[in-house]
Amino acid sequence: DICPPATTENYGSFTQGAAYSLLAKLYLNAEAWGVTFSGNAYQKVIDNCDKVMAMGYILEPNWKDNFSVTNENSKEAILAATFSSSDTGNDGNVKNELHNNTLHYKDYLSLGITASGTWNGICAQPEYVRLFDEEDARLDGTFLTGLMIDKSTGKPIMTDHNNELNHTIDVNMIPGMEYDGTNWSAVEQHDGARCFKWEFASDLTSSMGNDFHIFRLADIYLMKAEALLR
């Protein structure tokens, strides 16, 4: 009761909906974490999920709306870390720089966004990508893969080392391998599926304005379903 009610005005705050969601998550994993208490843990999961479901949250008809540039309007969001495209990182606000962390420095030519010089960083583990069925809409909606085409020319994008920018699912590297002096141009720097779940704004430069939903209603439905089965 000490948490504020789950209202639009309290978006981004730790509301009652967030509190019940966290309790459900804790009870669901209590056994794995070695936590003991009186009562049936799975019934407590169900009870807390039911409380969240009664608060007026709604599943978005299009799941991608939860990751759009304007996802602060999602009726599914329960607890969100909020971001703004105007965040500088120098004003006490953490910037959302997912695009810098995952995109190749020439992906912007294919995506039609302003941001260039991204850091060519993280990519998904191949085993994880292959968990998705090829016909699952979430596959293409989550990962950026394949040959990148320049929107302005219609031709394949070439990296600075004269290789076609083709994001393969497999990654040509050995985890933990120490640098052996190989020339950077010989490294398959375009390998790996990049994160494509959050929408990239066309005018994106240094900071993304998409919020990060820590809890959303879909998670509540899945937790209740697991508790009922277990």
Residue ranges and their predicted role:
Residues I2-G12:
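Flexible helix-coil transition and linker loops at the boundaries of alpha-helical arrays
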Residues C3-P4, Y27, M53, L228-L229:
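A structural signal for long alpha-helical coiled-coils and helix-turn connectors
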Residues E9, N120, D203-S206:
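Hydrophobic alpha-helical segments with strong N-terminal bias
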Residues Y11, F37, K44, S206-H213:
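Conserved aromatic-histidine-acidic binding/catalytic patches
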Residues S13-P175:
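An aromatic- and glycine-enriched ligand-binding surface/loop that stacks and positions planar moieties
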Residues T145-R230:
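C-terminal substrate/ligand-recognition segments
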